[in-house]
């Protein structure tokens, strides 16, 4: 069973995201629970929480089909203590919003060392940040996303993800989300059946499929190994359609949100229908 959808807008309230996902005939969706480019947000009103839960029940979306994403401003590996604390507070708020909405996953980019501390120290800070927030929340899993490795962003190697998981005390509440565009840009080839086999074998050996909690299905405008994060519509970029068909046929990707963040929302419904047809 595959859960397929897109990162839909929550404009007008988080309950509207559910309706937009349903209109795409999606069986999964992602959303921001607050403005992703602001630090602070008003608390979720009780009536909006109720509307969100009612819409999920009405349209058949369980927590395992929904992959909320945190703010882009958060850096859980920030080298400067004051800025690190600000990120940790914001991440806690994001986790608490998920708790309120009855959601069990929160997807986030791990963090950046900003050329001020070494990789290992930054990865340890990220794990420490996760531990602090998991201690203050319950029921929500921290889902680390791999990155393309732009700038000083960590998470572009599977080993980075494994190192963070290793530092998290409650292994039952940490997982990973693999973005195909990011992986490709970071040097993990996905253009053929053979390279898909190799890349996902490596993921299984280094991180473990038991930690896989979601996928972002994106083609890439960026070149292989370029460390540049530029998404494209499925089949229109440098990856091609093989990997997406591969994922839809492989049971290791069952029952997790498979989320489009492709560049043209106007064709999401078509892309979702095409993905479903690959099974």
From Swiss-Prot:
Zn(2+) 2 binds at residues 145, 179, 216, 261. Its cofactor is Zn(2+). It is an enzyme of class 3 (hydrolase). SUPFAM superfamilies: Xylose isomerase-like. Binds 3 Zn(2+) ions. The keyword Nucleus does not apply. Keywords: DNA damage, DNA repair, Endonuclease, Hydrolase, Metal-binding, Nuclease, Zinc. It catalyses: Endonucleolytic cleavage to 5'-phosphooligonucleotide end-products. Pfam families: AP_endonuc_2. Zn(2+) 1 binds at residues 69, 109, 145. Belongs to the AP endonuclease 2 family. Endonuclease IV plays a role in DNA repair. It cleaves phosphodiester bonds at apurinic or apyrimidinic (AP) sites, generating a 3'-hydroxyl group and a 5'-terminal sugar phosphate. This is Probable endonuclease 4. The lineage of its organism: Bacteria, Pseudomonadati, Pseudomonadota, Gammaproteobacteria, Enterobacterales.
């Amino acid at each position: 069973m595959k859960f397929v959808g897109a990162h839909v807008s929550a404009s007008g309230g988080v309950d509207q995201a559910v309706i937009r996902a349903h209109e795409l005939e999606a069986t999964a969706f992602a959303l921001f629970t607050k403005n992703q480019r602001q630090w602070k947000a008003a608390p979720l009103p009780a009536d909006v929480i109720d509307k969100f839960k009612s819409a999920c029940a009405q349209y058949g979306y369980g927590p395992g089909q929904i992959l909320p994403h945190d703010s882009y401003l958060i850096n859980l590996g920030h080298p400067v203590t004051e800025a690190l604390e600000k990120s940790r507070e914001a991440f806690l708020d994001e986790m608490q919003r998920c708790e309120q909405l009855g959601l069990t996953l929160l997807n986030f980019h791990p963090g950046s060392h900003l050329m001020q501390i070494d990789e290992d120290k930054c990865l340890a800070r990220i794990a420490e940040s996760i531990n602090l927030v998991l201690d203050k929340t319950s029921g929500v899993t921290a889902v680390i996303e791999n990155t393309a490795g732009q700038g000083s962003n960590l998470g572009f190697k599977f080993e980075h993800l494994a190192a963070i998981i290793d530092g998290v005390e409650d292994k039952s509440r940490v997982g990973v989300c693999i973005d195909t565009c990011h992986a490709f840009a970071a040097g993990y080839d996905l253009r053929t059946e053979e390279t898909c086999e190799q890349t996902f074998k490596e993921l299984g050996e280094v991180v473990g499929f038991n930690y896989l909690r979601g996928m972002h299905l994106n083609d890439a405008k960026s070149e292989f190994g370029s460390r540049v994060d530029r998404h494209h519509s499925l089949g229109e970029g440098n990856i091609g359609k093989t990997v997406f068909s591969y994922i839809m046929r492989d049971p290791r990707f069952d029952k997790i949100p498979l989320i489009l963040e492709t560049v043209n929302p106007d064709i999401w419904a078509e892309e979702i229908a095409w993905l479903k047809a690959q099974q």
